[in-house]
C-alpha cells in the first residue's frame, strides 16, 4: 500500500513510519516541522519520501500529492493547552482547516482508508471510568475543541461522502521520541530532563491523579491493524485501559519530588474503555508501564538536550491557564 502520514516527523508519526516501512509499505511523510523533527526520520530517510508542507494552506498541492495513495493517517496538528488558550486561531487553522484540507484531498482521490488522530481530551472531566466512546463530549480548552471539531469533520465526510474514515481518540502516549517541549502533557519529557539535570521531579497537584498511559509501540500496532481492518465510520478509544498515578511514574523514574498547585480543568482520573477496539480489531496492549519506563531510562540520553522545566518556569508558563480556566470566581 502507498501510505501518507501527516505529521510523520513527530513523536507518534515517526514511530508509525517505522511500522509501515517494516511491513513493506510505501510511505510519504507530510510535515511542516513546526513541532516534528527530521532527525526522527534519519534512519528511514532512504526508504521514504518527505514533503515539507503546511496543510492549512497548500490545498491545490495536496490534491496532486494524494494521487494514487491508498491509506491516509492524519496525525498532524498542534497540541498543548496553554498555547491554544493564548492563540486559539492558530489552533483552528492547524487542527480544523488543516483537517478539512486533508479530507478534501483524500475524498478527491478515493482513499481506501482514512485514519484520524483524535484526542481523549474531548471528554473533559468524565463522569464514568473507564470512559467509553459514547461518553459526553465536554471540551475544556481550544486544543480539545479543535481536535474534536476535526473528528466531527472526519465523521461527517464519512457519512456524506461515504469515505472510509475512522477516528482514534488517543489517551496519554509515551515512548521513544516523545516530545520534550511544553509544560503540559509531556510528563515523561519533563521528568526525564529533570532527572538528567539532577533536579527534583515536578509534580502538578498531589500526584494521586491517574492517567491512562499507552506505549507508542502498542499505539502504532493498533493504528496499523485499524488500517488493515478498515472499520469505516467508527470511533475508538486508544489507551491501555489501566490507570497509573503520576506519583507512580515519578517512583519508576526515581529521584526527589516537588509538588506545585493543581491546574484547573484537568481531570483527577483518566482511563480508557478499550473494549470496543479490542473486540473489533483483535488488538491488545502488550507493554506494561514498568517495562515501558525501563526502556526510556535505558535511553535517557535521548533527553539530554530537552529543555529543563523548573517549578518556577512551569508556573509562569501556565499563568494564562489559571487566569482563564480557574472557575472559582464563577461560583
Feature names for model-found ranges:
Residues 16, 223-227, 250-253, 274, ...:
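Hydrophobic "lid"/C-terminal helical patch
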Residues 216, 248, 263-295, 303-309:
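Conserved C-terminal active-site "lid" loop/helix of NAD(P)H-dependent oxidoreductases
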Residues 36, 57, 86, 94-97, ...:
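Residue-level signal for the nucleotide or nucleotide-sugar donor/cofactor binding architecture
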Residues 134, 189-203, 229, 255-261, ...:
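A short C-terminal helix-loop "cap" of Rossmann-like NAD(P)-dependent dehydrogenase/epimerase domains
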Residues 6, 173-177, 203-213, 236-244, ...:
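Glycine-rich Rossmann NAD(P)(H)-binding loop
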Residues 148, 173-189, 197-208, 216-217, ...:
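Glycine/proline-rich active-site loop of Rossmann-fold NAD(P)-dependent oxidoreductases
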Residues 229-264, 273-274:
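Mid/C-terminal beta-alpha module of Rossmann-like enzyme folds, strongest
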Residues 1-173, 217, 299, 303, ...:
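N-terminal Rossmann-like NAD(P)+-binding domain of SDR-like oxidoreductases, especially those catalyzing
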Amino acid at each position: 500500500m502507498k501510505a501518507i502520514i501527516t505529521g510523520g516527523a513527530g513523536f507518534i508519526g515517526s514511530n508509525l513510519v517505522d511500522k509501515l516501512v517494516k511491513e513493506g509499505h510505501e510511505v510519504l511523510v507530510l510535515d511542516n516541522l513546526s513541532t516534528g523533527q527530521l532527525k526522527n526520520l534519519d534512519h528511514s530517510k532512504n526508504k521514504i519520501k518527505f514533503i515539507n508542507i503546511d496543510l492549512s494552506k497548500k490545498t491545490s498541492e495536496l490534491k496532486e500529492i494524494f494521487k494514487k495513495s491508498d491509506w491516509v493517517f492524519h496525525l498532524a496538528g498542534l497540541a498543548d493547552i496553554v498555547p491554544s488558550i493564548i492563540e486559539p486561531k492558530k489552533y483552528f487553522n492547524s487542527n480544523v482547516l488543516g483537517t478539512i484540507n486533508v479530507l478534501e484531498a483524500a475524498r478527491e482521490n478515493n482513499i481506501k482508508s482514512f485514519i484520524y488522530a483524535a484526542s481523549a481530551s474531548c471528554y473533559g472531566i468524565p463522569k464514568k471510568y473507564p470512559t467509553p466512546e459514547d461518553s459526553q463530549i465536554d471540551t475544556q480548552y481550544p486544543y480539545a475543541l479543535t481536535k474534536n471539531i476535526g473528528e466531527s469533520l472526519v465523521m461527517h465526510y464519512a457519512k456524506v461522502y461515504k469515505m472510509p474514515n475512522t477516528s482514534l481518540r488517543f489517551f496519554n502516549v509515551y515512548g521513544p521520541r516523545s516530545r520534550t517541549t511544553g509544560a503540559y502533557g509531556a510528563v515523561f519529557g519533563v521528568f526525564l530532563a529533570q532527572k538528567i539535570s539532577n533536579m527534583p521531579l515536578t509534580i502538578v497537584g498531589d500526584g494521586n491523579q491517574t492517567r491512562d498511559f499507552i506505549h507508542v509501540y502498542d499505539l502504532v500496532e493498533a493504528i496499523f491493524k485499524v488500517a488493515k481492518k478498515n472499520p469505516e465510520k467508527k470511533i475508538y478509544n486508544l489507551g491501555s485501559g489501566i490507570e497509573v498515578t503520576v506519583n507512580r511514574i515519578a517512583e519508576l523514574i526515581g529521584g526527589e519530588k516537588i509538588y506545585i498547585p493543581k491546574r484547573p480543568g484537568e481531570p483527577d482520573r483518566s482511563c480508557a474503555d478499550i473494549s470496543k477496539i479490542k473486540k473489533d480489531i483483535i488488538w491488545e496492549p502488550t507493554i506494561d508501564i514498568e517495562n515501558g519506563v525501563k526502556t526510556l531510562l535505558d535511553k535517557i540520553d535521548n533527553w539530554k538536550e530537552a529543555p529543563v522545566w523548573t517549578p518556577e518556569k512551569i508556573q509562569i508558563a501556565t499563568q494564562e491557564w489559571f487566569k482563564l480556566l480557574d472557575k472559582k470566581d464563577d461560583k
